[in-house]
């Protein structure tokens, strides 16, 4: 009959955080080895694609690694991917351009109205 293994921690239930792997020791005894949960890659906040250049760790482990492992040296580095940052910059530029165009058109219409009033007098 096969040798049985038991959980080594206090939690007796087969939960996601209490997973075990059965390992045979050099002495031939089967032991339960607790397995850590797999880390997921950080994702872009806009498009959801995996961020390049950022370590794949469990949340608590980010506190122990240096800043270079958690960010990239770019605007929104570590939060947004390069393509989304590019789109944001272009969108912001176009919005500012649109505001300027709107302002110029408004000034031109006001100038035209003033010239019409002067012409009528």
Swiss-Prot record:
GO aspect biological process, one term: cytoplasmic translation
Lineage: superkingdom: Eukaryota
Record's GO cellular component terms: cytosol; cytosolic large ribosomal subunit; preribosome, large subunit precursor
GO MF annotations in UniProt: structural constituent of ribosome
Pfam families xref list: Ribosomal_L34e
Matching InterPro entries: Ribosomal_eL34 (IPR008195), Ribosomal_eL34_C_sf (IPR038562), Ribosomal_eL34_CS (IPR018065)
Name this polypeptide is given: Large ribosomal subunit protein eL34A
